Amino acid sequence: MRALAGCLLAVSCASFAQQPGDVVVTATRVDQPSLEVPASIDRVYAEEIREGRPQVNLSESLGRVPGITVLNRQNYAQDLQISSRGFGSRSTFGVRGIRMIADGIPASMPDGQGQASTFDLGSAERIEVLRGPFSSLYGNAAGGVINVITEDGPAVPTLEMGLYGGSYDTWRGALKFGGQWGALNAVGNLSRFETDGYRDHSAAQRDQLNAKGRLALGDATRLTLVATSLRQPDTQDPLGLTAAQVAQNPRQVVPQAIQFDTRKTIEHDQAGATLDHALSDATRLQASAWAGSRFVEQFQAFSGATPATASGGVVNLDRTFGGGALRLFNDSALGGRPLRFSAGVEVERMAEHRQGFVNNNGVAGALRRDEDNVVSSTGAFAQAEWKFADRWSGHLGVRSTRVAFESTDHYIVAGNPDDSGSKDYSATTPVAGVVFRLDPATSLYANVGRGFETPTFVELAYQNPPASGLNFALEASRSRHAEIGVKTIRAGAYRLTAALFDIVTSDEIVVDQASGGRTTYRNAGETQRRGLELGAELLLTGPFEARAAYTYLNAEFSDAFGAVAAGNVLPGVPKTQFYAEAAWRHAPTGLRVGAELLYRDRVAVNDVNSEFADAFTVVNLVFGFQQQGSKWRLNEFLRVDNVTDTAYIGSVVVNDANGRYYEPAPQRNILVGLQASLQF
């Protein structure tokens, strides 16, 4: 894509030239150096994603990104909890508040719900993370954008195999093949991951396929096809623990998890196509379409047989989704100075058949819920960048979004009325920014904007008993963002970033109650997030490499509501977080020795701030070797996580009604891996 964009946008190459050592980004929808983007944006490269890492969870590689907190639940039934500047911390499963994208195709549903497990890290070329108000140009995402880009196939057809195993009967095997055949470039990755889990009743299996093909249809047109598939059968859910249970035995599970055999099965398939066509040297048109299906069966930690309005303790969800987008990109001039413009329209739709059954101790029983749900999203955006002076550029953008929810109830019996209903949410979200180039390697920037985030269908799914049906009383949250920052990239030396931000959100969507795998939500009043993000990376060509990320985030409720006092901190959000990584390579022997350190401040587990998960520091060590010939390469690694055997809480279940807030992280554990590649 970068090579194509370079040709298509050649008219302004001189004006928008990339500085040495700079980073080209695509999360703003337009390829350009990060020094020219008035926003916080970071990239994690393939080597950083895969070298000495299991390539299963985003928590392995996103710790190095300031402003991002990834809480690894060690619970593959509920996926990671990812938050950006505190957005998404309310999620009891999956990802919310952050737009997930894979190869330009949405990995989030139209309602904003996303699953990090659908990303294939084994074939990722890079991960781009955008934070701040420019994410509003993607619509239903107030916190940011995570964009995973699959690598292209190598110039020479190459077969790559990987295998690792370690503690808790964990193993992963992968097979990847790719290459260039005339006008076609393709790559595919197939993997299986299995683990018994650190905790009892936490076994998981994940089979994953990711494929990408790119076909040049002449000099001006390129077609990209992508497909992904995920199978995750009978993934056990250990649920959370109380503080007393953690102190007694952090690996245990509560009796309800065994009694009701809490577990989840996921089947996810998705495919998409993007056609990129140069209308002229200065203008290109991009059209995308995608479609997919998702099946979920979840056994929760209760029967759900009573009262009459109960929805059961087994969720059966059959979903189809799809959409399309048309985008125009143009480079021209205004007042004799470069002007870059983009605009587009996007349409998405998701339809699901949701049923609920009584959980008869791990076996689905009588039907207690039956409904069809549809959510559709339409949006239009426009964005412009104008270099109005030699060292100044201004950025303006706006998006109009409408998200419509509709539910048709088919389970209408005595004591359980017709709960059909519908609700629409809409917003226009502007954003503006300015960049000043202090010198060729340093830029100062500022931005302001508005954000918009609707409830997801999962958040609308339940009301507190005895009420039934969807919770259409939930409103969308709306936010105002302001940020200033500095970036400097010195080729062959270092990369430094700093950002200060202030965010005020009204009608914040918060957890009301969470119990047995079921969660209800409500709107709070106003919240405020103020923070500082710092990033540093050495870009030396010698044997040493190092990087660090620091986040300070004061996220609190400005207004009291219910039993929650004004000034309480948002649950699931650490006030400070620090990550550091250093490595040394010895080229003659292929040896690499690395160390990672993560410090995370204490985290509130509920809105009333009555309990906290303690702060912790964890150290990991990695040892690797590499051998290679003219057509082959071999890599081995030994990874020791939590070297000091620290007891800590990896994630929390926000506002759990039973006080089971805590999800303990593993003790010291080891992985040994081998990777081989062969060119043909």
Model-derived regions: residue spans:
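N-terminal periplasmic accessory domains that precede
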Residues: L58-S61, Q81-R85, I98-A102, Q115-S117, ...
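Surface-exposed extracellular loop regions of Gram-negative outer-membrane beta-barrel proteins
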Residues: P233-A247, R349-N360, A404-V413, S422, ...
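Gram-negative outer-membrane beta-barrel transporters
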Residues: R327-N330, D390, R495-V504, R522-N606, ...
